């Protein structure tokens, strides 16, 4: 493989309240086999050697499982490939001489910590508000004691695939967290183990979502288009149904 020349425009921001800017970098020795984040590692090593501050970005597993990474790449959350996280993107997706613009997730509820790293603890607080069950569901053999229809199990599994990366919020013009919250509400509302808190969960998680300052959902579908786990916006409809049902049922 020939080495690629890549020009980067990377967002730099010293802290949440600092003024940010795009900074240009030229890389001349990029292998097409490198992952996108390895390419940033190479740039950071160069910056450190030159005595400059490395670019802050989040990553952990680097195999599309954990939800830690997430970059806005040329205006698209997680980059150009469908159903993938940023860490699953490779430089062979790009051509020699390309310019790539890299920005953080942008949402009031996700303040920039530094450079490309944002604070997603708002998601944790939505989960804490209701994304749990209080009933002990037993050990593995007990799973067969409560029968779940295959169709319901499949829908619950599809919703539970969410890795809380925040791409849905970043891509949405309203910065709505409806797909994330909808996935979490759905996955428990579809299973019998989730039924004791069902009404309270829907109300509390939606209320927390609104309190965090996420925008409202206007059914654009941008979220589903960039979701690395390709979670359906049918989960948003299910959340709305759960919320309405809980509101009418007098839960609190």
Residue locations for each model-derived region?
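Eukaryote-biased recognition of intrinsically disordered, low-complexity regulatory segments
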Residues: 4-25
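Short strand-turn-strand beta-turns centered on an Asx-Gly dipeptide
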Residues: 11, 28, 73-75
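Short, structured protein-protein interaction patches enriched in aromatics and acidic/basic residues
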Residues: 56-68
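Glycine-rich phosphate/adenylate-binding loop and adjacent beta-alpha elements
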Residues: 73-95, 102
């Amino acid at each position: 493989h020939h080495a690629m020349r890549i020009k980067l425009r990377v967002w730099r921001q010293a802290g949440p309240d600092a003024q940010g800017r795009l900074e240009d970098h030229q890389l001349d020795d990029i292998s097409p086999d490198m992952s996108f984040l390895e390419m940033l590692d190479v740039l950071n090593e160069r910056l450190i050697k030159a005595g400059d501050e490395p670019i802050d970005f989040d990553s952990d597993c680097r195999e599309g499982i954990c939800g830690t990474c997430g970059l806005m790449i040329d205006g698209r959350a997680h980059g150009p490939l469908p159903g993938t996280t940023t860490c699953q993107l490779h430089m062979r997706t790009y051509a020699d001489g390309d310019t790539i613009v890299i920005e953080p997730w942008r949402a009031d509820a996700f303040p920039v910590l530094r450079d490309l790293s944002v604070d997603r603890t708002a998601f944790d607080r939505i989960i804490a508000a209701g994304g749990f069950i209080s009933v002990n569901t037993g050990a593995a053999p007990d799973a067969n004691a409560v029968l779940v229809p295959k169709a319901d199990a499949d829908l619950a599994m599809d919703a539970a695939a969410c890795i809380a990366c925040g791409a849905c919020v970043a891509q949405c013009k309203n910065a709505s967290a409806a797909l994330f919250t909808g996935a979490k509400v759905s996955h428990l509302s579809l299973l019998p183990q989730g039924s004791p808190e069902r009404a309270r969960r829907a109300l509390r998680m939606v209320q927390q979502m609104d309190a965090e300052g996420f925008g409202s959902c206007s059914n654009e579908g941008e979220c589903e288009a960039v979701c690395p786990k390709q979670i359906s916006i049918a989960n948003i409809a299910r959340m709305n149904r759960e919320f309405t049902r809980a509101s009418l049922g007098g839960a609190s």
